[in-house]
Swiss-Prot record:
Domain of life from the UniProt record: Bacteria
Protein name from the UniProt record: Tyrosine recombinase XerC
Catalytic residues in the record: 159, 182, 250, 253, 276, 285
Location within or outside the cell: Cytoplasm
General function of this protein: Site-specific tyrosine recombinase, which acts by catalyzing the cutting and rejoining of the recombining DNA molecules. The XerC-XerD complex is essential to convert dimers of the bacterial chromosome into monomers to permit their segregation at cell division. It also contributes to the segregational stability of plasmids.
Domain (Tyr recombinase) ranges: 116-298
The entry's keywords: Cell cycle, Cell division, Chromosome partition, Cytoplasm, DNA integration, DNA recombination, DNA-binding
Any single Pfam family the record assigns to this protein: Phage_int_SAM_1
Amino acid sequence: MLDTSIQALINKWQKYLALQRNYSNHTVISYNNDLKHFLEFMNYYNSELVTINHIKTADIRLIRSWLAKRNCDNFTASSISRGLSAVKNFYRFLEKTTQLNSHIIFSIKSPKKTKLLPKALSEDDVVISLEHIEEYGNVKWVELRNKALLVLIYASGLRISEALSITKLHLQNLEFIRIIGKGSKERIIPWLPIAKNLITQYLEILPYKLGDNEPIFRGKQGKKLQPPVFNRELIKLKHFYGLPQHLTAHSFRHSFASHLLEHGADLRSLQELLGHKSLSTTQNYTKTSIKHLEAVYTTAYPIKK
């Protein structure tokens, strides 16, 4: 249970994240869920209605108990780390907007996350996917939407959230797409004709009228297409054609990066295309490419021990 004044603060915090920090809707929802989990634990821990004073005076024992509870509930290290980041973010917001001074929560370090290498698809699996994605949709414009979106992600390396934010304004430039990605970082990506042509064909038969600033990829009811809806289309494709279990919309972004590396792209250029803040993040793709080369060597090299 929360004091009504706290809910008002949470609402202001969410607006701050979305409008001033330019966080994606997905991140705002995730952060809100993490904060809700923390405050519910605080309510249980104190056995009384949570007030702003409870939040300000939360000690290190309470915070560590909450993190331990998440660990016992089988949250991954990544989820625990994100949850702590969300709560810290809320406390920073309180520092800006209330009389809260530096809080003990900022002394707590996030658990180390296990680094998972990005999983790419083989070029053959990508070709199969692009050739057959149109079979799932039941309506012509939906079928064309699915193909246009999948080709766009693989041809440009966009995150699914970025691809679903493309508007008609993005189509006005014939040579490149200007994308605002994570952390409001801007990057420029060349248009591939096949992607732009498919999008143009899709828009010609889309049964909904859109303004220039509205996202072009729509669901069957005319609302903005959401990532889980598109991934459900990919699940059908994956099951029918026996494609890898890790096939998702995001795996086509990984495939874009890995295949470019395998064909000679340099890391700095790839970093710019992917919108990575750190080169070390991009370097993870070299590890997957090396694994690919090792597999090719093992199966195809004529001289074996």
